[in-house]
C-alpha cells in the first residue's frame, strides 16, 4: 500500500566477491564461469508471470543471456541459471522455491518468456497440478507445479538445437 519494494529476486547472480543474497543465487553462480557480472548476464523477465492462487506460488519465465554468445558471458560453459527458466517463487517473500531450465547454457535467444498456463490434468491415471509452457525452443513442456518436476516435453515445431528432452 505504500509502494515500498517488498522483495527482489535476481535472475542472474552478481559478483561473488560481494556475497550472494541467498542460497539460490549461490546455486546459480555455480553454473556460470568467468566474470559474467561484468556483462550483465541477461535473463530478463518481461512477460511470463503467472500466480497460482491454490498453491500460493508465483511462476516467472526468464529470458536469454546477454551477451547472447555464451563464450563471451560464461567462457567456461555451464548452464547459466536462471536463464531460459521457469522459476517458482513465494509471492510474499520472493524466496526461491524451484526452477526448471528449458535451455541450459542458452545461446540462441530461445527465451522462456512465453505464457505459463496452469491446469489440473489427468496423467497416467493420476491427478496432477500442472504448468504448461511453450517457449521459443520448439518444445512444449508440462511440469508438476508443486515441485517443478518435468512430466513431459514434446516437440511442437522444428528445432535443430536438440532432438529431445530427457525426462
Residue ranges and their predicted role:
Residues 41-71, 85, 110-135:
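Repeat-blade elements of multi-bladed beta-propeller folds
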